[in-house]
Amino acid sequence: MAGCVPLLQGLVLVLALHRVEPSVFLPASKANDVLVRWKRAGSYLLEELFEGNLEKECYEEICVYEEAREVFENEVVTDEFWRRYKGGSPCISQPCLHNGSCQDSIWGYTCTCSPGYEGSNCELAKNECHPERTDGCQHFCLPGQESYTCSCAQGYRLGEDHKQCVPHDQCACGVLTSEKRAPDLQDLPWQVKLTNSEGKDFCGGVIIRENFVLTTAKCSLLHRNITVKTYFNRTSQDPLMIKITHVHVHMRYDADAGENDLSLLELEWPIQCPGAGLPVCTPEKDFAEHLLIPRTRGLLSGWARNGTDLGNSLTTRPVTLVEGEECGQVLNVTVTTRTYCERSSVAAMHWMDGSVVTREHRGSWFLTGVLGSQPVGGQAHMVLVTKVSRYSLWFKQIMN
């Protein structure tokens, strides 16, 4: 009997424990709450330790402005991001052209272009020339079947990327030393005066090849014996004088209408580059009319008339393109495909015939216009010029 007592006591203890609620262990629902709270507290601690993660805060989840501000730590950048973030899906507007596919991202969208197209919005055909290209040809561009081809102005050759143009000749056109690139240039190596047999200056001209000067047809027919004169880079007071051996007036020059008012003057001997002068570049048609003239500011340069004489100092003025219709109304002229107009915002001047308009593009200066006789009574702050790019074939026929 005594041996049964411990057995009975153990049985009673087991029954008692079975009726007691196991408070050491929580129910599943409460246990999950504890786990969730602990997990959130842990992630919050990590977020405090590390910089804000934009993708986690605003892409995987919906963020508030303050969370984005913690990531950028800059109000301007945050505001820019917030405008895009709250603007909705950019791909809804179908920004990717030519059947490109659009993918939303935290910063906006990304386009995957169809074969043959490129650009941020697939807007550029790979075989075409576009002025908008930031990585396109430095000078001239020719479209092809699968891709475009680059070429360069006189005295340059293509670089290793087949896009950049590298000067390889001492007479490479349009190159200025770094200290003479400012738009208020007072001494341009391609600008020359024309002088008659009596030593009187009567017109201006511009060197476009070391042995050719371009001027107006009217100027070239004023005198029989013409000499080109330049003071560029002269150490003495005496100018460099070179005689003209041949005058090439454009075959379609119309003196009455003033059309095709251009003439090429062939020099007796070539100018020694770069010390005595330097040619300016002559642009191809598409390059000039789609990029140079409409997209860059021009520089009008020449000598102003002081009565019947020309001033001693070369004058330069910044100019911009004027639409043909406006120019035609102001100057009472017909603006053709071979002419265009420039406007200067500074005081009016009486420019001599043969003054020129040049434009700088990526380190090279290009000739875009030559001034002829201006309309009577026209406003001197606006000038009509001959569009040089329309005559590139004629230049090649004469000079080559």
UniProtKB/Swiss-Prot annotation:
Give all residue intervals belonging to the Gla domain. Answer: 41-86
Question: Which SUPFAM superfamilies does the entry link to?
Answer: EGF/Laminin, GLA-domain, Trypsin-like serine proteases
The compartments listed are: Secreted
| Tissue occurrence | Plasma.
**Keywords for this entry?**
Blood coagulation, Calcium, Cleavage on pair of basic residues, Disulfide bond, EGF-like domain, Gamma-carboxyglutamic acid, Glycoprotein, Hemostasis, Hydroxylation, Repeat, Secreted, Serine protease homolog, Signal
Sites where a glycan is attached: 93, 99, 225, 233, 306, 332
The record's note on quaternary structure and interaction partners says: Interacts with SERPINA10.
Q: What name does this protein carry?
A: Vitamin K-dependent protein Z
- The species this protein belongs to is Homo sapiens (Human)
Q: What is the lineage of its organism?
A: Eukaryota, Metazoa, Chordata, Craniata, Vertebrata
**Gene name as annotated:** PROZ
